[in-house]
Curated annotation (Swiss-Prot):
GO terms for biological process: tRNA N2-guanine methylation. This is tRNA (guanine(26)-N(2))-dimethyltransferase. S-adenosyl-L-methionine binds at R36, R61, D78, D121, A122. The keyword Transferase applies. CDD domains: AdoMet_MTases.
Length: 378
């Protein structure tokens, strides 16, 4: 395996040299640098003591947690032997010492940190460490669903989860049967698919967590490029679980682009999409702390758009779903107008309205559908 050295954040990382990332014997995706930037900022903000990077590949995520955060104990795991050996090389490259190896596990003891690298199945590792970790990061190829039960048992009752889902085609309705099978939910196609897909993912996590009398607080959830990313704080107790379940519900949309959603355990009429999460997609204080950290932790920002993206999320109105102005124009026989003009008109009418990260042609607003259409006619 031919290797090249790259730098991301404070980490120096050996990664496989390959024409295409999917051809490499150990997976490394440079596009996910922004994902890793935000994850490092999140761990900095939350200050967990024990962190698990359950699906490590090159180890770049776990290495950055080790180098850039205050976590006292960082575990990295992969089932691939090539990945395991590569993580050991990367540990030595960054810390100057060889980890002690025994029985498929390596450990590196530093003055203020304990670093552990495990060779094995992620579900097995999490099952063997019941309520041990304060923060578990799941960054799989595809869906995180197969790891949810183990992660929810392995994380502490008031711990944190960071999850990535790259099966956007499934969650966005291109593979409807797969979404029903994996997420037990009906997906929607069209301009709302990315937000609805993200909310289906969160809704699934809520249902899994509720089995263990765990509630869910969404600290941050977003869509970007080819993936969804969610940061959650778990809340212990049946009452907290019930409160989270009560924020699940369904979405309807007609041919004009008008949508309706309602929080309920069962859909009130036919044609529903879901179940899905209808609660907040961000904790404003948490998100503002991430933005603050980008200004004081420049070494942790490797992607040029991290600050810009987080700033957009801070300003975004946190209401369910959005209106795509191009789709509304097409469906209602209107001319496309500038988003800035629509937002200004809605503000002048006394409504809130912002851009959204889900689409460059969409707005989030608390204005009724008819008012949004009128604002596009002026």
């Amino acid at each position: 395996m031919e290797l090249v050295e790259i730098r991301e954040g404070l980490a120096r990382v050996l990664v496989p040299k390959a024409e295409r990332i999917y051809d490499a014997p150990v997976f490394y995706n440079p596009v996910m640098a922004l994902n890793r930037d935000i994850s490092v900022l999140a761990v900095k903000a939350l200050s967990p003591r024990r962190v698990l990077d359950a699906l490590s590949a090159t180890g770049i995520r776990g290495l950055r947690y080790s180098l850039e955060t205050s976590a006292e104990e960082v575990w990295m795991n992969d089932i691939n032997e090539d990945a395991f050996r590569l993580i050991l090389k990367n540990l030595e490259l960054n810390f100057g010492s060889k980890p002690v190896l025994a029985n498929g596990r390596a450990e590196l003891g530093l003055p203020e940190k304990r670093l552990v690298v495990n060779l094995g199945d992620a579900n097995k590792l999490m099952s063997e460490n019941f309520r041990y970790f304060d923060f578990i990061d799941l960054d799989p190829f595809g869906s995180p669903v197969e790891f949810l039960d183990s992660a929810l048992r392995s994380v502490r009752r008031r711990g944190f989860l960071g999850l990535t889902a790259t099966d956007t085609g499934v969650l966005c309705g291109a593979y409807r049967r797969a979404c029903r099978r994996k997420y037990l939910a009906e997906p929607i196609r069209g301009e709302l698919c990315h937000e609805a897909g993200l909310r289906i993912l969160i809704g699934t996590i809520v249902r899994y967590a509720a089995k263990y009398d765990l509630g869910v607080e969404v600290l941050l959830a977003y869509y970007r490029d080819h993936y969804f990313r969610v940061f959650l704080r778990l809340r212990s107790g049946a009452k907290k679980a019930d409160e989270s379940v009560e924020l699940l519900g369904y979405l309807w949309q007609d041919e004009t682009g008008k949508f309706k959603y309602e929080r309920d355990f069962l859909p009130g009429k036919r044609g529903a999409y879901g179940p899905m999460w209808l609660g907040p997609l961000k904790n404003q204080a948490f998100l503002e702390e991430l933005v603050r950290l980008t200004k004081t932790s420049e070494e942790s920002i490797s992607h040029r758009k991290t600050f810009q993206f987080l700033s957009l999320l801070v300003e975004e109105l946190d209401v369910p779903f959005h209106y795509d102005t191009h789709a509304l124009a097409r469906k209602n026989g209107l001319e496309v107008v500038k988003i800035s003009r629509v937002i200004e008109t809605l503000h002048s009418l006394g409504f809130e309205a912002t851009r959204t990260h889900f689409s460059p042609t969409s707005i989030k607003t608390n204005a009724p559908f008819d008012v949004v259409l009128r604002s596009m006619r002026k």
